[in-house]
Amino acid sequence: MSDEINETCKPQACAIQNCLMKNGYNESKCSYYIDELYKCCKKFYESNGSSASSVCCPKFNLLQLKLKQRELGQIDANLIDTKHG
């Protein structure tokens, strides 16, 4: 077993971070990039099995849940305005 860190899907994960920074961490504006990461991670698990691991991908069971939620059109997150004024 290798001690090497698996960074499969790193470009997609970095794209999410860049999008979040550009959009004030409003996750709903970065759905495209989140979907791209999930697609990449799905391919990763299909090729390597459900016990595989990448620091850029959610665990297999969580990815399955997220993919199912997105198929149903559920939104991952909304920015809640907590400013009072």
Curated annotation (Swiss-Prot):
Domain of life: Eukaryota
Pfam families found in the cross-reference section: CMC4
Disulfide bridge positions per record: C9-C40, C19-C30
CHCH domain location: 6-48
Compartments where located: Mitochondrion intermembrane space
Mitochondrion listed as a keyword: yes
Gene Ontology cellular-component annotations: mitochondrial intermembrane space
Locus of motif Cx9C motif 1: 9-19
Main location: mitochondrion
Entry's family note: Belongs to the CMC4 family.
Record organism: Candida tropicalis (strain ATCC MYA-3404 / T1) (Yeast)
Gene3D superfamilies: CytochromE C oxidase copper chaperone
Keywords: Disulfide bond, Mitochondrion, Repeat
Domain notes: The twin Cx9C motifs are involved in the recognition by the mitochondrial disulfide relay system.
Motif stretch (Cx9C motif 2): 30-40
Protein name per Swiss-Prot or TrEMBL: Cx9C motif-containing protein 4, mitochondrial
